[in-house]
């Protein structure tokens, strides 16, 4: 009897193991399907506004405001982009001098449209200067705090981190007083100075964690070979810190390119205004050209997208390396 039971249980064991494997495989595929569906839903929410921005940039005003909206333009046009690049010409039609046509035709542009390209140049200059100065200040500071032991080192690191706890809007008045005393109101250098105060703490924090994760033997070996502190930093540590450097470069560039509040406070004329300020000025108390604003917005996101695509493979690794010690 016992022998028969053992034979029966042995005969059922392979079937049970097959069922378990099938269940595990089904659960694995269901898990993947849920992750895929969630990823597609998030991607749809994130990319839908961008897709509409691109599509509406090639539509006229009447098609943009039509119901239901046209995700694919019926009659694609480049008129909006031509108006941007011809905004300073004799054919400019402004809110004040627009033709006696139906405003829905989109045959008018804002009176401040001629400031768009200079504002893009100002934004690029400010972002580039902030990135360069950010690296010149942040790299030596992070290296010193990570590899040189001195009194007050930990307190300095915590102080740098606490500066990012303060919201930017609380710093507007102190920044304004400093910029006014320096005589830099309505000058792009005012934005460079304030953006450095915002981005340098992040740069120092990320690079400190990365430099601390590198073994001290690298520094000692470089010193034995006759390298100074500066040579050890530039020849040994910086090449290894490239992912984190790219991450802080992107953060500084995108922050400077997109910042609105401080630029609104410190710039008044087209000579110093950046792109977000000029884009905000395209609205009027009486009417608005969605087609023109969308085309200008599409041009505004091109440089950051190009920078992000070029350095995309460094972004995640750089932020991860700076977020985890060791």
Task: Annotate each PLM feature.
Residues 11, 23, 32-326:
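A structural signal for multi-pass alpha-helical bundles of membrane permease subunits
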Residues 1-26:
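Short, Lys/Arg-rich, polar N-terminal cytosolic tail immediately upstream
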């Amino acid at each position: 009897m016992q022998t028969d039971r053992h034979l029966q249980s042995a005969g059922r064991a392979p079937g049970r193991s097959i069922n378990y494997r099938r269940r595990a495989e089904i659960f694995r595929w269901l898990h993947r399907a849920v992750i895929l569906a969630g990823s597609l839903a998030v991607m749809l929410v994130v990319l839908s506004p961008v897709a509409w921005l691109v599509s509406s940039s090639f539509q006229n005003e009447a098609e943009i405001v039509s119901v239901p909206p046209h995700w694919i333009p019926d009659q694609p046009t480049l008129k909006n982009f031509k108006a941007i690049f011809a905004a300073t010409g004799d054919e400019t039609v402004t809110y004040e001098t627009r033709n006696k046509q139906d405003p829905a035709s989109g045959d008018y542009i804002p009176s401040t449209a001629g400031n768009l390209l200079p504002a893009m140049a100002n934004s690029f200059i400010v972002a580039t200067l902030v990135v360069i100065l950010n690296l010149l200040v942040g790299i030596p500071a992070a290296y010193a705090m990570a590899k040189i032991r001195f009194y007050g080192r930990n307190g300095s690191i915590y102080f740098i981190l606490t500066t990012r706890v303060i919201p930017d809007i609380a710093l507007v008045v102190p920044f304004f007083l400093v910029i006014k005393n320096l005589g830099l109101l309505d000058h792009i250098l005012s934005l460079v100075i304030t953006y450095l105060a915002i981005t340098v703490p992040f740069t120092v924090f990320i690079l400190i964690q990365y430099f601390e994760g590198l073994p001290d033997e690298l520094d000692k070996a470089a010193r034995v070979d006759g390298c100074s502190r500066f040579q050890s930093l530039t020849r040994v540590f910086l090449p290894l810190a490239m992912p984190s450097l790219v991450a802080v470069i992107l953060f500084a560039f995108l922050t400077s390119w997109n910042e609105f509040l401080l630029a609104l406070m410190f710039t008044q004329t087209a000579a110093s205004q950046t792109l977000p300020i000029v884009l905000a000025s395209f609205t009027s108390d009486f009417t608005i050209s969605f087609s023109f604003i969308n085309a200008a917005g599409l041009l505004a996101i091109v440089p950051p997208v190009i920078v992000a695509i070029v350095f995309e493979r460094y972004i995640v690794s750089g932020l991860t390396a700076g977020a985890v010690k060791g």
